[in-house]
């Protein structure tokens, strides 16, 4: 199996130049629900997304997860699907959004078709998984269980996972549109998320200049007595007005940022809602 770091640069498409069909499988204690869909769906590759080996979990739980990961990868290879293992904190909604969305964006940029199995993980994890699918317009699907490895069937868990799938019924979920901020606003939210602290007006102008946003090619002159601050004047006012009009007012109205004032100066901070948008953007 291949180990994938979600921060790796995009990998080249298939050697034959054809688009691939790629599945994302956030995995808990399941086998059948991860493998049986390939009796219905064609795929060249699948990402098996699991907790990292050094996760802060009981060693017995980690060993159990390694078992399921190994069995699923073996099952995928048996049906001609190449598994790639990616790691994620499956108990952190923001990290699930970040990892799943970045993989979706990576594969879509290569022109590949992406499908997401939202039923092979825990209930809490399935929420951000489905949200990421809808934001990026890819198909999420649910694999129905015929029975569960409990009671008299508990002995089947090691070979089937918690859910026993016999009929292999797969139900696609129908997407509804989730409105996202425009591309430049998403970049700004991601920068706020990365910094983990506020951005001053100078930080904002520098960021817009660095990213090549329209109208920010020339910045105001710096004050002589205060390093890093820009002199007040027509150019400074023009760029601050542009920043407010194009980005800050919209993000504030949506509840994605907040401003903290200190006298006549302010700093911009990302809100909890803004963190969700940054993570689901696929840009982190």
Locate predicted features:
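Long, low-complexity, Lys/Arg-enriched
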Residues: 1-113, 127-284
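Short glycine-rich phosphate-binding loop at a beta-alpha junction
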Residues: 113-119
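Polyanion-engaging groove/track-forming segments
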Residues: 121-123
């Amino acid at each position: 199996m291949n180990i994938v770091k979600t921060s790796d640069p995009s990998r080249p498409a298939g050697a034959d130049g054809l688009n691939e069909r790629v599945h994302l499988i956030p995995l808990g204690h399941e086998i059948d629900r991860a493998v049986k869909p390939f009796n219905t769906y064609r795929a060249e590759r699948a990402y098996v997304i699991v907790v990292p080996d050094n996760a802060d979990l009981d060693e017995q739980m980690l060993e159990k997860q390694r078992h399921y990961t190994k069995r699923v990868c073996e099952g995928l290879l048996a049906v001609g699907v190449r598994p790639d293992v990616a790691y994620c904190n499956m108990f952190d909604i923001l990290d699930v959004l970040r990892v799943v969305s970045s993989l979706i964006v990576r594969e879509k940029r290569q022109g590949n078709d992406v499908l997401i199995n939202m039923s092979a993980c825990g209930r809490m994890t399935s929420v951000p998984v489905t949200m990421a699918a809808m934001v990026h317009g890819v198909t999420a699907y649910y694999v129905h269980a015929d029975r569960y490895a409990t009671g008299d069937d508990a002995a089947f868990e090691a070979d089937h996972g918690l859910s026993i799938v016999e009929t292999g019924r797969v139900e696609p979920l129908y997407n509804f549109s989730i409105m996202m901020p425009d591309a430049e606003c998403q970049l700004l939210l991601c920068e706020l998320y990365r910094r983990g602290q506020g951005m001053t007006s100078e930080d904002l102008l520098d960021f817009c200049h660095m990213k090549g946003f329209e109208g920010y090619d020339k910045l105001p002159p710096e004050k002589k007595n205060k390093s890093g601050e820009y002199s007040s004047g027509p150019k400074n006012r023009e760029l601050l007005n542009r920043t407010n009009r194009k980005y800050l007012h919209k993000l504030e109205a949506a509840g994605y940022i907040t401003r903290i004032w200190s006298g006549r100066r302010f700093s911009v901070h990302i809100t909890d809602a803004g963190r969700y948008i940054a993570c689901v953007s696929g840009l982190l």
